[in-house]
Amino acid sequence: MRSNVHQGHVARKRFGQNFLVDDTIIHGIVNAISPQAGDVLVEIGPGLGALTDPLLERIPQMQVVELDRDLVERLRRRYGERLQVHAGDALDFDFDKLAVPGRPLRIVGNLPYNISSPLLFHLMEFADHVHDQHFMLQKEVVERMVAEPGSKAFGRLSIMLQVRYYMEHVLDVPPGAFNPPPKVDSAVVRMIPWPRHGDGRLRSPHADCDITVLGDVVTAAFSQRRKVLRNTLSFLRDQVDFDAMGFDLGRRAEEVPVGEYVELARRLGDKASGQAA
């Protein structure tokens, strides 16, 4: 356990700061990431460098995105030219500009739990240029991300992310691994974007579709979780033949596999495109 926890810095609630201090957990995360010398490695919210230190023991240079101005200056003084510090909000950051042809762009971080879902959706915009992502998140969020249909955890977040990524729950992290300790358990998730075929289609287990249409469909489906889809998706009957596609509206939203939502969104998108033409 690290003794120089805050190094004079007071954790700020508005930034959702909980500093990782357990060396066993830290090295478990770094081993899961397995950084290589040729990687373009970017850490979101490095804080006091709990992950940055051991990562830089394995690679010569890396980059970070940090919002807290006090920490930005600390990081620049501490690591010098080995660390390129981007001062700003990861929610607004253009990660595409960090991509280098021929070098894997890898994103890692102990994400602030108060912005984790918006940040995950923001990062989807850059998935075509990202090799993989490893994030520490609230355990409940990770369970929702990797949830299977039919489980209570399965929902909008599960579907939207599983369409774009292969995901794996890597390890659990107890509150005592942080200072100050959060009130919830944490976990690390690995996210690998599905690659694309030469024609641009996603090489995933699910059909490709308009992600905006999918988001609208899934939001409507889960708007009343306790009711069957006949109540939440009936407004789409004039746009798609549910019976013809074998889509059973007698189910609840969490009982429908990801692929069926994607196929529904694809048909709706095709119909909208045909009408526009």
Curated annotation (Swiss-Prot):
* Reactions it catalyzes: adenosine(1518)/adenosine(1519) in 16S rRNA + 4 S-adenosyl-L-methionine = N(6)-dimethyladenosine(1518)/N(6)-dimethyladenosine(1519) in 16S rRNA + 4 S-adenosyl-L-homocysteine + 4 H(+)
**What are the coiled-coil residue ranges?**
none
Is Methyltransferase one of the keywords?
yes
Q: Where does S-adenosyl-L-methionine bind?
A: 18, 20, 45, 66, 89, 110
| EC identifiers of the protein | 2.1.1.182
Q: Which Pfam families match?
A: RrnaAD (PF00398)
Transmembrane residue ranges: none
Respond yes or no to whether keyword Translocase is given for this record. Answer: no
Q: Which GO terms describe its cellular component?
A: cytosol
Compartments it resides in: Cytoplasm
Which keywords accompany this UniProt record?
Cytoplasm, Methyltransferase, RNA-binding, rRNA processing, S-adenosyl-L-methionine, Transferase
Signal sequence residues: none
Superkingdom is Bacteria
Query: What is an example of a GO molecular function annotated in this UniProt entry?
Result: RNA binding
Family matches, as SMART domains: rADc
Q: Which HAMAP family match?
A: 16SrRNA_methyltr_A (MF_00607)
Cited function: Specifically dimethylates two adjacent adenosines (A1518 and A1519) in the loop of a conserved hairpin near the 3'-end of 16S rRNA in the 30S particle. May play a critical role in biogenesis of 30S subunits.
Q: What protein family does this chain belong to?
A: Belongs to the class I-like SAM-binding methyltransferase superfamily. rRNA adenine N(6)-methyltransferase family. RsmA subfamily.
User: What protein does this entry describe?
Assistant: Ribosomal RNA small subunit methyltransferase A
Q: Which organism is it from?
A: Cupriavidus taiwanensis (strain DSM 17343 / BCRC 17206 / CCUG 44338 / CIP 107171 / LMG 19424 / R1) (Ralstonia taiwanensis (strain LMG 19424))
Q: What phylogenetic lineage does the species belong to? A: Bacteria, Pseudomonadati, Pseudomonadota, Betaproteobacteria, Burkholderiales
Provide the gene name from the record: rsmA
